């Protein structure tokens, strides 16, 4: 290790500040673990774990209104690698699709010039992973290919569209929230636009419903909300309702099919779309803080809610196995009256002011255990959920909230108490399934009650609001290389100075120094600076001047001018001399002051008649070198004096020594030699004065008369033999002091605000700042190098400029950002892999595709050579060292908890696959391995149960640890049936019109609940037009099971009905006579595949149900449907493991196929026959080839050797390296 390492590499970057009102909803948390948000016209990308800025994307010319990460719901391989794709949309209607890692725009899309209302990637990525749907105001939805920028189709609707939501269970369902209501689209397809206008329904706002108001006076708000039965009507409500449509948000619930939430400021309504009615209300008490936003979770039926005070709350659906009533009212006979979401955790609120308020919240889509809050001042706060096992006695049972239990499983597999687990990995590993009504927890199972709490684990602060005064620390030299840090001091309008480290872009120190706006900063060394601030003038035009000297390491600051500063003319500028010895303080209406920086003493206050200064600059020349030479001579003479006899010393020499010894004693190591320095300044008439300062003497040396071609001089810069002056009229005058020539250049850019030379010996570049931008000049050639003009090539106005290094400039701008740019001043995004980060970031997406896939294989196939290791050098991976180092950095950046799991021999292959899919944010694999782990484990339980105990024991375990209901038809039949029964109970309790009652009756008949169906049919009132029909139906239902002939009649009638377009009625009749299998076949014939699957799950025995679902699998795999990933999950739920392996192999998912085969063999899920053997070896051989293509030799050898005869040739090839490189 080197004794010191100094990192002064500074890459181009942008420091961002407060957001714009347009950016309010522009934030997204990607599956890759990165958060992107809009800041004015920029898109900022940060890491959610370390809260570091990784990328700032700049290309939009207007404020960004939406950002969306592409989904990762596809199989990743070399052809479809892990990559960071992001779509951002602005107020001018432009959509840009970015390759975030490279910082380049892949494609730009423009349809109209109005703000994009909403944009989303299609979640079903089997056919294409490049499709993006956008709302172009006022009423168009357009489907784009985001890879090529091609418009696939466009469709307009009658009303203005505000936002939309895709059904997470069915890619053909889309719902639009419009200015008047909701439009349901049921034929969404990438290949053609939706056909009709969609099904339009109106929302009457809960506040405006007259029934609601009436009830509210009678019984309290909670009861009233329970009675809000219908919200969705086909009829347009009367005028006073429409104006009150204050629905903030609409979203499908990913936790259960056909449910949707509507968000209002004071309540969240949960709708069941099968009956179009409210089945749950989350209301805020009168004193509570209104909602701003809600994000529904797919795991555990949870809701993340953001409130107006910046507080984030988590609510989880209550389980009904232990209901207690909290009031004196009589308990309800049927406990499930309402879908209730209990408050389980909340984080701290923020201090809301006029300028600081919460903008938006996003939630981690992979684990759903963390939320990020974006605040208008540019802060991003990352809150993580943590679970703690709590003591039974400590629980407050009077709260009426059922307890939460930790789940039985970890990473998909039930684990023992002593096994390693990481409960905070994800929401479903923190809390178990909410039990369904009447479901008791199994005896003897280890259920530990848990509490959840939010912890602030990341905070990113933005720059405060402009104005800014910026100053870069002194430049890097050979002398200061050991302690140099590239620090930028930023003075702000609230009086504080922020110091940023420009290698990492992170805030190094924040110092509250002044009580008013900082006007200027000058560094006096690498670790100290002077800053000045002036208060607002009083009626005499006088101010309070604050000039502070700040020591950066300690943060200590002293008033540099002591007691001076109250009620005087404002300081205009401060200038520190080249050797940091002297300070010139220039006032508006008061003579110049000269100070000694080292002793903080006033050297000279100029007389009253001293000219008014308009610009001042110190000369880079001084006499320190000649002083140092004299000093060195002294030392040598002194050294000689000790050796040589006195007589040999000349008298002259000894007299010089005595003089210099005096100087030497005053300053150890030449610290306080007062060298002679000089400065120039100009007065109002443009006359140039030249003054010399040495110690405490100030001499006036020369004056140069004004140049007629120049206006009033505003600034001066001096380097080497070049002096440059700028004036009010935009002229630059270049003086060559050696050649004694001057050259004036009119820039035609009005007032020259500031000019400054670049650091570095012989570097004669100069930056000039104007009211409308900046320019870089080469003073040697007297030529402009680059120019930037507000309104022409950038949208922002420049507030201050400086040099960062010899080839990079710093611009502070009125959009609240500070940009470090190349000399060309072109806004450039950077390559993320070139960036210097203070903390390592886990993001395999940043690696080249080959490396990210090799890293995944390395993690999945542990142990290597019988050893669990996270050291990449332990395996044979003949890749270049740079890539290996990058892989090792990724491995090192994993948290200790994750490392512990990966190195645990008890951690099974299935758990490892699930963990790695979470680490990679791979949506497709996460769902595949969740379902695979569940059913492979169930199979092994059944096997062990059948050998040791009576048959009844096996299903018991299935219900105690079921697959989460968000997996819908993939769940076990018994659990799915219970859920559907609970749902129909709820629908029944909530019904309020005949239409709803009829829908409930239909559901009850399909579910085989004939008694309750008959009760509902007999409720039809005599004046209803369906009274006769319903009465007959009730008679039919009660007598239907009696005789054989009646069954054949009913079957005939049912088939006729179906043939004549009455599919639902015919299916119902078939279910009445227990011919549900036929009903399913008819539904499938008529394209109602989802309905058929539902009916099979609730009515058929396992064999018949499997038949129906297998036909569905064939349909899903057909080219016109192309939903093979869904088909795989259905096959897993049926236990058709061999078919899954075959399908994976045919889809060329070799990695997943090989891992799945290994897991199946471990669980004994395959009968090993000749056929299976053939498939297994083919899978292993193909996987070995793909690992060879990744350059992962050891993995390839491992699987080639497992493949037997099929892998023999490959094995030989791998083990005998050829002379010439193999072409891939």
Swiss-Prot record:
It comes from the Eukaryota. Ubiquitous. GO terms for cellular component: axoneme; ciliary basal body; cilium; cytoplasm; cytoplasmic vesicle; cytosol; intracellular membrane-bounded organelle; lysosomal membrane. InterPro entries: WD40/YVTN_repeat-like_dom_sf, WD40_repeat_CS, WD40_repeat_dom_sf, WD40_rpt, WDR11. Gene3D superfamilies: YVTN repeat-like/Quinoprotein amine dehydrogenase (2.130.10.10). Changing residue 395 to W: In HH14; does not affect the interaction with EMX1; does not affect the subcellular location of the protein; decreases capacity to shuttle from cilium to nucleus; decreases GLI3 protein levels. GO terms for biological process: cilium assembly; head development; heart development; intracellular protein transport; multicellular organism growth; regulation of smoothened signaling pathway; vesicle tethering to Golgi. The keyword Phosphoprotein applies. Its main location: cytoplasm. It is found in: Cytoplasm, Cytoskeleton, Cilium basal body; Cytoplasm; Nucleus; Cytoplasm, Cytoskeleton, Cilium axoneme. Keywords: Cell projection, Chromosomal rearrangement, Cytoplasm, Cytoplasmic vesicle, Cytoskeleton, Disease variant, Golgi apparatus, Hypogonadotropic hypogonadism, Intellectual disability, Kallmann syndrome, Nucleus, Phosphoprotein, Proto-oncogene, Repeat, WD repeat. WD repeats lie at residues 59-108, 111-154, 354-393, 471-510, 566-605, 708-745, 747-787, 793-831, 893-940. Disulfide bonds: none annotated. Component of the complex WDR11 composed of C17orf75, FAM91A1 and WDR11; FAM91A1 and WDR11 are required for proper location of the complex. Interacts (via the N-terminal and the central portion of the protein) with EMX1. Interacts with GLI3; the interaction associateS EMX1 with GLI3. Interacts with TBC1D23; this interaction may be indirect and recruits TBC1D23 to AP-1-derived vesicles. PANTHER family: WD REPEAT-CONTAINING PROTEIN 11. It is linked to A chromosomal aberration involving WDR11 is found in a form of glioblastoma. Translocation t(10;19)(q26;q13.3) with ZNF320. Involved in the Hedgehog (Hh) signaling pathway, is essential for normal ciliogenesis. Regulates the proteolytic processing of GLI3 and cooperates with the transcription factor EMX1 in the induction of downstream Hh pathway gene expression and gonadotropin-releasing hormone production. WDR11 complex facilitates the tethering of Adaptor protein-1 complex (AP-1)-derived vesicles. WDR11 complex acts together with TBC1D23 to facilitate the golgin-mediated capture of vesicles generated using AP-1. This is WD repeat-containing protein 11. It comes from Homo sapiens. The gene is WDR11.
């Amino acid at each position: 290790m080197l004794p010191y390492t100094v990192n002064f590499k500074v890459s181009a970057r942008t420091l961002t500040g407060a957001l714009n009102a347009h950016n309010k909803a522009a934030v997204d948390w990607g599956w890759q673990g990165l958060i992107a948000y809009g800041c004015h016209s920029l898109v900022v990308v940060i890491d959610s774990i370390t809260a570091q800025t990784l990328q700032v994307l700049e290309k939009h010319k207007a404020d960004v209104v939406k950002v969306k990460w592409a989904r990762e719901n596809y199989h990743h391989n070399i052809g479809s690698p892990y990559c960071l794709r992001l779509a951002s949309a602005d107020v001018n209607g432009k959509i840009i699709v970015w390759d975030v890692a490279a910082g380049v725009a892949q494609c730009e899309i423009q349809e109209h010039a109005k703000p994009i209302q909403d944009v989303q990637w299609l979640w079903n990525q089997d056919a294409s992973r490049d499709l993006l749907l956008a709302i172009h105001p006022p009423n168009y939805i357009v489907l784009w290919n985001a890879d090529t920028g091609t418009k696939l189709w466009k469709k307009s609707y009658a009303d203005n569209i505000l936002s939309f939501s895709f059904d997470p269970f069915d890619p053909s369902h889309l719902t639009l929230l419009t200015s008047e209501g909701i439009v349901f689209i049921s034929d969404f397809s990438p290949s053609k636009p939706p056909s009709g206008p969609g099904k339009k329904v109106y929302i009457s706002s809960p506040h405006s419903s007259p029934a609601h108001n009436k009830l509210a006076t009678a019984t309290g708000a909670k009861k009233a909300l329970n009675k809000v039965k219908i919200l969705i009507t086909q009829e347009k409500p009367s005028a006073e309702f429409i104006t009150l449509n204050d629905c903030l948000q609409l979203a499908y619930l990913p936790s259960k099919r056909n449910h949707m939430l509507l968000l209002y400021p004071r309540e969240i309504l949960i709708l069941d779309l099968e009956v179009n009615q409210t089945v749950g209300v989350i209301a805020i008490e009168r004193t509570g803080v209104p909602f701003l936003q809600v994000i529904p979770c797919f795991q555990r039926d949870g809701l993340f809610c953001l409130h107006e005070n910046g507080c984030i709350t988590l609510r989880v659906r209550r389980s009904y196995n232990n209901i207690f009533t909290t009031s004196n009212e009589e308990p309800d006979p049927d406990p499930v009256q309402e879908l209730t979401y209990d408050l389980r955790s909340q984080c701290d609120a923020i201090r809301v002011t006029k300028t600081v308020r919460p903008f938006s919240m996003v939630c981690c889509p992979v684990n759903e255990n963390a939320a990020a809050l974006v605040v208008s001042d540019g802060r991003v706060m990352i809150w993580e959920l943590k679970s703690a096992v709590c003591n039974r006695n400590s629980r407050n049972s009077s709260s009426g909230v059922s307890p939460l239990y930790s789940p039985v499983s970890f990473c998909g597999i039930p684990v023992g108490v002593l096994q390693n687990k990481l409960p905070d990995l994800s929401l479903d590993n923190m809390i178990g399934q909410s039990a369904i009504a009447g479901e008791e927890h199994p005896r003897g199972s280890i259920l530990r009650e848990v509490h959840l709490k939010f912890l602030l684990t990341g905070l990113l602060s933005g720059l405060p609001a402009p104005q800014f005064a910026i100053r870069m620390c002194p430049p890097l030299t050979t002398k200061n290389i050991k302690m140099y840090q590239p620090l930028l001091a930023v003075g702000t309008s609230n009086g504080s100075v922020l110091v940023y480290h420009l290698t990492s872009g992170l805030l190094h120190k924040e110092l509250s120094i002044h009580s008013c706006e900082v006007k200027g900063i000058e560094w006096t060394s690498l670790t100290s600076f002077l800053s000045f601030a002036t208060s607002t003038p009083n009626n005499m035009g006088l101010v309070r001047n604050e000039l502070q000297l700040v020591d950066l390491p300690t943060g200590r600051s002293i008033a540099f001018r002591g007691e001076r500063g109250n009620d005087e003319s404002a300081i205009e500028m401060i200038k520190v001399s080249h050797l940091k010895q002297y300070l010139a303080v220039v006032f508006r209406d008061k003579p110049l002051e000269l100070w000694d920086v080292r002793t903080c003493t006033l050297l000279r206050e100029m007389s009253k008649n001293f000219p008014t200064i308009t610009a001042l600059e110190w000369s880079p020349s001084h006499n320190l070198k000649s002083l140092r030479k004299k000093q060195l001579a002294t030392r040598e003479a002194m050294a000689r004096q000790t050796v040589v006899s006195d007589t040999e010393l000349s008298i002259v020499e000894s007299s010089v020594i005595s003089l210099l010894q005096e100087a030497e004693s005053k300053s150890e190591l030449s610290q306080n030699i007062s060298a002679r320095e000089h400065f120039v300044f100009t007065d109002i008439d443009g006359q140039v004065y030249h003054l010399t300062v040495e110690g405490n003497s100030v001499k006036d040396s020369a004056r140069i008369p004004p140049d007629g071609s120049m206006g009033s001089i505003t600034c001066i810069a001096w380097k080497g033999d070049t002096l440059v002056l700028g004036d009010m009229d935009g002229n630059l005058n270049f003086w060559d002091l050696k050649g004694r020539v001057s050259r004036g250049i009119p820039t035609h850019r009005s007032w020259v605000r500031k000019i400054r030379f670049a650091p570095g010996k012989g570097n004669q570049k100069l930056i000039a700042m104007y009211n409308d931008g900046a320019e870089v000049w080469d003073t040697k050639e007297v030529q402009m190098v680059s120019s930037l003009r507000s309104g022409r090539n950038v949208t922002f106005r420049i507030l201050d400029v400086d040099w960062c290094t010899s080839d990079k400039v710093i611009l502070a701008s009125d959009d609240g950002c500070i940009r470090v740019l190349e000399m060309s001043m072109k806004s450039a995004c950077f390559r993320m892999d070139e960036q210097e980060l203070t903390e390592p970031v886990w993001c395999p997406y940043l690696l080249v595709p080959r490396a990210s896939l090799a890293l995944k294989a390395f993690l999945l196939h542990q142990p290597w050579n019988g050893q669990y290791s996270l050291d990449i050098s332990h395996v044979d991976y003949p890749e270049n060292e740079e890539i290996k180092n990058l892989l090792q950095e990724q491995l090192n950046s994993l948290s200790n908890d994750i490392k512990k799991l990966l190195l645990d021999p008890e951690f099974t292959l299935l758990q490892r696959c699930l963990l790695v899919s979470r680490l990679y944010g791979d949506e497709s694999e996460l769902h595949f391995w969740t379902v695979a782990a569940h059913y492979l484990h169930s199979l092994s339980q059944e096997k062990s149960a059948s050998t040791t105990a009576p048959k009844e024991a096996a299903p018991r375990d299935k219900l105690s640890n079921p697959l989460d209901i968000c997996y819908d038809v993939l769940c076990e039949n018994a659990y799915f049936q219970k859920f559907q029964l609970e749902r129909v109970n709820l629908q029944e309790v909530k019904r309020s019109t005949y239409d709803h009652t009829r829908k409930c009756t239909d559901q009850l008949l399909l579910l085989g609940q004939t008694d309750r169906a008959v009760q509902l049919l007999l409720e039809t009132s005599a004046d209803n037009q369906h009274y006769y029909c319903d009465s007959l139906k009730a008679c039919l239902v009660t007598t239907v099971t009696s005789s054989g002939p009646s069954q054949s009649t009913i079957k005939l009638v049912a088939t006729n009905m179906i043939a004549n377009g009455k599919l639902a009625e015919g299916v119902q009749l078939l279910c009445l006579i227990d011919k549900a299998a036929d009903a399913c076949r008819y539904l499938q014939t008529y394209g109602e595949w989802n309905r058929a699957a539902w009916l099979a799950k609730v009515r058929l025995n396992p064999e018949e149900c499997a038949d129906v679902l297998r036909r569905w699998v064939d349909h899903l795999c057909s080219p016109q449907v192309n939903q093979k990933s869904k088909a795989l999950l259905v096959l897993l739920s049926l236990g058709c493991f061999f078919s899954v392996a075959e399908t994976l192999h045919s889809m060329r998912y070799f990695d997943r196929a090989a891992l799945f085969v290994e897991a199946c063999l471990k669980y004994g899920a395959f009968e090993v026959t000749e056929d299976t053997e053939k498939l297994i070896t083919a899978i292993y051989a193909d996987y070995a080839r793909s690992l060879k293509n990744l350059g992962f030799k050891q993995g390839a050898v491992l699987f080639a050797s497992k493949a037997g005869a099929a892998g023999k040739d490959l094995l030989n090839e791998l083990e005998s390296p050829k002379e010439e490189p193999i072409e891939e």
